[in-house]
Amino acid sequence: MNEAMKREHMQQLMDPDAAQPDVRLVRMYESLCEACAKRPEGLNDQDQMMVADITTMEKLKQQLYEDIRKRGVVEDFRNGRQRMMRDNKSVQNVRMLMDQQRKHLAELRLTPNSRKAAPVSLDDGFDDF
């Protein structure tokens, strides 16, 4: 694991109201890095950056959940004398983040279906030629 990169990622996970990163996000970051390191190809810098993206998305997702708790799934909207109900855009954003997290986890081969797939072989036989 690249320790300098890890320190940078921990700074990104800092809670603005606290002096240290969110413990739950740190645990998530470390467990995903550990799971990547156990793979046959190990953990490289690109994988570590993707893990940081996943944990940052989790942080954003929690903020969106808080907004949904406060304002609800639909919100009252007023335009002059008109009053309407409209969808809370946080719901759509949470769905997008969840899909992106799923794609990142699949790319890291950390989902059950992605583990079943055969690993991509980069050996084209040129070395044997």
Please annotate each region the language model reported.
Residues 124:
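Low-complexity, rRNA-contacting terminal tracts
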Residues 15-16, 92-119, 127-129:
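Alpha-helix capping/hinge segments and adjacent helical runs
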